[in-house]
Curated annotation (Swiss-Prot):
Name by which UniProt lists this protein: 4-hydroxy-tetrahydrodipicolinate synthase
Organism: Pseudomonas aeruginosa (strain ATCC 15692 / DSM 22644 / CIP 104116 / JCM 14847 / LMG 12228 / 1C / PRS 101 / PAO1)
Main location: cytoplasm
Gene: dapA
InterPro entries: Aldolase_TIM, DapA, DapA-like, Schiff_base-form_aldolases_AS, Schiff_base-form_aldolases_CS
Cell compartments where the protein resides: Cytoplasm
Keywords recorded for this protein, A-Z: Amino-acid biosynthesis, Cytoplasm, Diaminopimelate biosynthesis, Lyase, Lysine biosynthesis, Schiff base
Positions of disulphide bridges: none
Alphabetized SUPFAM superfamilies for the sequence: Aldolase
């Protein structure tokens, strides 16, 4: 079972916007050393929207090669074209990924039936564990609990990243699906409470900069130690908030650069963190102990 702290890994670029393979390897090693339970490559935080298909597949392969089977690698393969999502999922499988993360189709705004047919088609086309990803704040496309329930019965679909931050929604999803269907948080600030409701982990932005703390938080929540999990979460809360001071992954890439882990690189239309945001984020990093 894929569970625990799953980092939504950034994709490092150099100042010219080229992929930085050395920094990517360094980040993977950092997470292996710091207790991260799984790595999500080329998701939203990994700037999948500004990678071309060849780069997308290269990043997956590089992460898989660096991990060497020590923890699961989940590849982001979602698209708003079902055909493209199938092709990316096939490529991820051939590249050695352990599972795929598939976002709801954005921009074209399918109906609930359209979403069901989209995900069912991908699951039937490619035999690899697949995780649904619901993040309506980015996609303007909200997969309702009843659609998740239908999809939970489709072979190869093993779980969902529920990134609404709505705990009542998460509770309903958990109650509707079978015990073997994995419900993950996609919202750091509410992840503890979702796991205490029965969720199986957190696909985390915060884990990029505080992997050990996030791993400890998830372990405590999943064993039912609410006091310990909430204490860690209270300590991390300034970071949860500051990492969204501008659009993700702008702040988290700046934070990793500040920690000396990646160069200053991001691809348009995203831009480097605004100077007015530097000190608030730096202060949050110091409060949570990730920066001296």
């Amino acid at each position: 079972m894929i569970a625990g702290s799953m980092v939504a890994l950034v994709t490092p670029f150099d100042a010219q916007g080229r992929l930085d393979w050395d920094s990517l390897a360094k980040l993977v090693d950092f997470h292996l050393q710091e207790g991260t339970n799984a790595i999500v490559a080329v998701g939203t935080t990994g700037e999948s929207a500004t990678l071309d298909v060849e780069e997308h597949i290269q990043v997956i392969r590089r992460v898989v090669d660096q991990v060497k089977g020590r923890i699961p690698v989940i590849a982001g393969t979602g698209a708003n074209s079902t055909r493209e999502a199938v092709a990316l999922t096939e490529a991820a499988k051939s590249g050695g990924a352990d599972a795929c993360l598939l976002v709801t189709p954005y921009y074209n705004k399918p109906t609930q039936e359209g979403m069901y047919q989209h995900f069912r088609h991908i699951a039937e086309a490619v035999a690899i564990p697949q995780i649904l990803y619901n993040v309506p704040g980015r996609t303007s496309c909200d997969m309702l609990p009843e659609t998740v329930e239908r999809l939970s019965k489709v072979p190869n679909i093993i779980g969902i990243k529920e990134a609404t931050g709505d705990l009542q929604r998460a509770k309903e999803v958990i109650e509707r699906v079978g015990k073997d269907f994995l419900v993950y948080s996609g919202d750091d600030a509410t992840a503890v409470e979702l796991m205490l409701l029965g969720g199986k982990g957190n696909i985390s932005v915060t884990a990029n900069v505080a992997p050990r703390a996030m791993s400890d938080l998830c372990a405590a929540a999943m064993r039912g130690d609410a006091a310990a999990a909430r204490a860690i979460n209270d300590r991390l809360m300034p970071l949860h908030k500051a990492l969204f001071i501008e659009s993700n992954p702008i702040p988290v890439k700046w934070a990793l650069h500040e920690m000396g882990l990646i160069p200053e690189g991001i691809r348009l239309p995203l831009t480097w963190l605004s100077p007015r945001c530097h000190e608030p984020l730096r202060q949050a990093m110091r409060q949570t102990g990730v920066l001296a």
